[in-house]
Regions:
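Conserved acidic donor-binding segment of nucleotide-sugar-dependent glycosyltransferases
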Residues: 284-286, 290-297, 306-311
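Carbohydrate-associated surface elements
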Residues: 133, 154
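N-terminal strand-loop element at the rim of the active site
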Residues: 6-72
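Active-site donor-binding acidic/aromatic loop of nucleotide-activated sugar
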Residues: 213-216, 226-235, 241, 290-291
Length: 349
């Protein structure tokens, strides 16, 4: 019997949390084929614990204070004693450090790397990286290549698709989504919208999400006189919201392998995104979307203006983007890749 302990202690319901939820049934199925279990562990009182309260099998929960907090470390040790895991797979640094302290030496350790900031332990830990750039970084930092694995994120294939530029009676709608945080670059999108307005283009922008940057963004929208064109609409169901758009803007500064970009591609939206590690693995410039320098409002405005001016080309980008997601980034692809990696970790002598 092979037991897996699968841990994620994020408090929100963003990309990291969604990847954990995507992994959990795959790991449960993998363990069940070997007569074992996969125990999912989340932060007590966090968004995932609340959203998954009726799940079968249930997720375990624990406190998530500091790495050395006696209550938190004690909970990790109790969970390890109860589950007796052969493999511990963690999302993020905190659960990785906690369960490394709590785990017996016989346990195989793995961490899913979502961003280019992570601890390195070269003798015992496998690194499951959601982007090729993250896998390359792990090897550069000294992790043996045999312990580094590339498993790109995936999305459920939506049944409702965008219909870009299908309604000539309304202005083109540019949509964006994500946590309202400086690294997401939504201030760049607001500045690009001001440039588009000054060029006399008709359009509207809707940004879905919440976060600490809301007040600043509201101020920028007012400062540029864009209140009638740019709206912050709060959190929305991602696929349904994205399907209302004609174009998707992704002006981020730093990413792993962003789910919301995959979701936009999956509904068939033409995309204008920052040419940064992660997105540049997902989009082929001039074939499945547009890539442009991060932080460059003029370049973003130019790309969006070009797409608006040539709807046929934009629609073609969206179709190619969706085809790429269907081919490489659906649930079946994730299950196959992740299961193969867990096989390798479990079978290593």
């Amino acid at each position: 019997m092979t037991a897996i302990l699968h841990a994620m202690l994020g408090k929100g319901l963003g990309g990291l949390e969604q990847v954990f939820l995507d992994y959990q049934p795959i790991l449960e199925a993998w363990a069940a084929r070997r007569g074992g279990i996969c125990a999912g562990v989340v932060r007590g009182g966090g968004a995932v614990a609340k959203a998954q309260s009726g799940r079968t099998p249930p997720l375990l929960s624990m406190p998530a204070h500091t790495d050395w907090d006696p209550l938190t470390l004690g909970a990790a040790r109790r969970i390890v004693r109860a589950v007796k895991p052969a493999i511990i797979l963690s999302h993020g640094q905190r659960p990785a450090r906690l369960f490394e302290k709590a785990a017996p030496k016989s346990a195989r350790l793995a961490i899913c790397v979502h961003k280019p900031v992570f601890d390195i332990e070269t003798t015992r830990t496998d690194y499951i990286c959601v982007g090729r750039h993250l896998a390359e970084l792990a090897v550069e930092r000294g992790v043996p290549a045999s312990r580094v694995h590339f498993v790109p994120n995936a999305v459920k294939i939506p049944t409702v698709l965008a219909q870009p530029f299908a309604d000539p009676g309304r202005p083109p709608r540019i949509v964006a989504a994500g946590r309202l945080h400086p690294k997401k670059g939504f201030d760049v999108l607001v500045a690009a919208a001001a440039l588009l307005r000054d060029r006399g283009l008709s359009f509207e922008v809707e940004i879905a999400g919440e976060g600490d940057e809301r007040g600043k963004l509201e101020g920028l929208i007012a400062e540029h006189g864009l209140g009638d064109r740019v709206r912050l609409v709060g959190w929305r169901d991602a696929s349904a919201f994205l399907a209302t758009g004609d174009l998707f803007a992704f002006p981020s500064y730093q990413e792993g392998f962003p789910l919301v970009l995959l979701e936009a591609m999956a509904v068939g939206l033409p995309v204008a995104a920052s040419a940064i590690p992660g997105p540049d693995e997902m989009i082929v410039e001039g074939a499945s979307g547009r890539l442009l320098p991060p932080g460059d409002a003029a370049a973003l405005a130019d790309a969006l203006a070009d797409l608006i001016a040539d709807p046929a080309a934009a629609v073609g980008f969206g179709r190619k983007a969706r085809a790429d997601v269907l081919a490489d980034y659906g649930p079946d692809s994730l299950a196959r890749r992740l299961s193969a990696v867990v096989d390798e970790i479990a079978n290593r002598a």
